[in-house]
């Protein structure tokens, strides 16, 4: 009930500003011609079938004047209207939001059973990487930082490690140190060059399941297992690193938390420049979005290299070209995915 008077609706029929219904006041039970004072959240008194809001009444001595007729059931919430007995509130794997906590508490669940956040060790690798002020031939480490923040956004708990040099013994020790985590992620050293040592190290310690995927950018990705701990080996080029993290690490984190990764938010847009792709490869194009005469238009970024990090940071979304296609033509309507949403 709301703050007001519980009544029998029939007693208020015809009530108005000039001819209010006059009712007596009772303490507990509503009967013909009598009303009981109620407050927000109160149980409806016996005998009542409606509530008149307090602002639609005036108290005159031991009586009230009602200036607005009530209909049966007015301002009354039936038991079970919010949550019914036996009703399932959430599916397994649902991520609890602030509003969920309020609902759970309202039905008496103060400590819901939840899955632990998956723990993820993020290990950036490469002897050329430094934290700041790079000398000629050196590069500031960004991949590990980026991936660790994505891990947190996707519901994991990341440990962002210091850079490990391109040395088999050092890489082996770094991976073994993080076997206490639910997932190990490395960045860099995933290809087949002289300094790309991580796939071999993982194969020595456990099993290398995949080395190379049909994605562009992002072909030199690898997946393995060491002592039942998944190892995701991401490329060193920043764009390729992000693409593979979204495609492989994101669903893994959601799976370990007991759920499935939700679809990325997406919107339809008209492509204003052709996007090319190689058949048999899934290509991801970065695009900027703009509204032109009420129509959403997607413009592929001109910087398409897998090492141009600004092309990701300044993009509004991604267009995925499926494996069977050779691309999209100018003017085609495409789905633009937002990978930066909080999911």
Predicted regions and their residues:
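Flexible glycine/proline-rich
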Residues: 64, 83, 203-343
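Short beta-strand segments
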Residues: 8, 37-39, 67, 91, ...
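Short glycine-rich anion-binding loops that position phosphate/pyrophosphate groups of nucleotides
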Residues: 12, 41-42, 127-128, 189-192, ...
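Short Gly/Thr/Asp-enriched flexible loops that form oxyanion-binding sites at enzyme active sites
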Residues: 193-205
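Phosphate-binding glycine-rich loops and their immediate beta-loop-alpha structural context
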Residues: 75-186
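Solvent-exposed alpha-helices and their adjacent loops that cap or buttress functional pockets
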Residues: 13-17, 28-31, 44-46, 58-59, ...
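Phosphate-interaction motifs
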Residues: 1-110
């Amino acid at each position: 009930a709301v703050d007001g008077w519980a009544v029998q609706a029939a007693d208020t029929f015809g009530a108005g500003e000039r001819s209010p219904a006059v009712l007596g006041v009772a303490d507990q039970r509503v009967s013909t011609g009598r009303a009981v004072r109620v407050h927000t959240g109160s149980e409806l008194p016996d005998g009542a079938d409606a509530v008149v809001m307090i602002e639609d009444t005036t108290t005159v001595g031991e009586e009230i004047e009602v200036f607005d007729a009530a209909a049966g059931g007015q301002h009354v919430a039936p038991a079970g209207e919010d949550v019914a007995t036996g009703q399932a509130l959430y599916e397994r794997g649902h991520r609890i939001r602030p509003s969920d906590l309020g609902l759970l508490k309202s039905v008496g669940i103060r400590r819901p059973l939840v899955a632990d956040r998956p723990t993820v060790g993020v290990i950036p690798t490469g002897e050329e990487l430094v934290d700041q002020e790079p000398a000629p031939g050196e590069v500031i480490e960004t991949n590990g930082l980026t991936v660790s923040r994505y891990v947190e956004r996707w519901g994991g708990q990341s440990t962002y490690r210091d850079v490990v040099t391109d040395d088999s013994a050092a890489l082996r020790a770094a991976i073994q140190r993080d076997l206490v985590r639910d997932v190990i992620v490395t960045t860099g050293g995933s290809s087949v060059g002289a300094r790309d040592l991580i796939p071999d190290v993982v194969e020595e310690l456990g099993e290398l399941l995949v080395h190379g995927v049909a994605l562009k950018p992002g072909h030199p990705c690898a997946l393995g297992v060491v002592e039942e701990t998944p190892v995701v080996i991401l490329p060193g080029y920043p764009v390729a690193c992000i693409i593979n993290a979204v495609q492989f690490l994101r669903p893994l984190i959601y799976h370990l938390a007991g759920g499935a990764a939700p679809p990325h938010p997406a919107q339809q847009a008209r492509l204003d420049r052709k996007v090319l792709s190689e058949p048999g490869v899934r290509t991801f194009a970065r695009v900027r979005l703009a509204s032109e005469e009420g129509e959403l238009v997607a413009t592929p970024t001109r910087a398409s290299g897998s090492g141009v990090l600004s092309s990701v940071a300044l993009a509004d979304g991604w267009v995925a070209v499926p494996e069977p296609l050779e691309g999209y033509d100018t003017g085609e309507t495409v789905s633009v995915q937002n990978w930066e949403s909080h999911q």
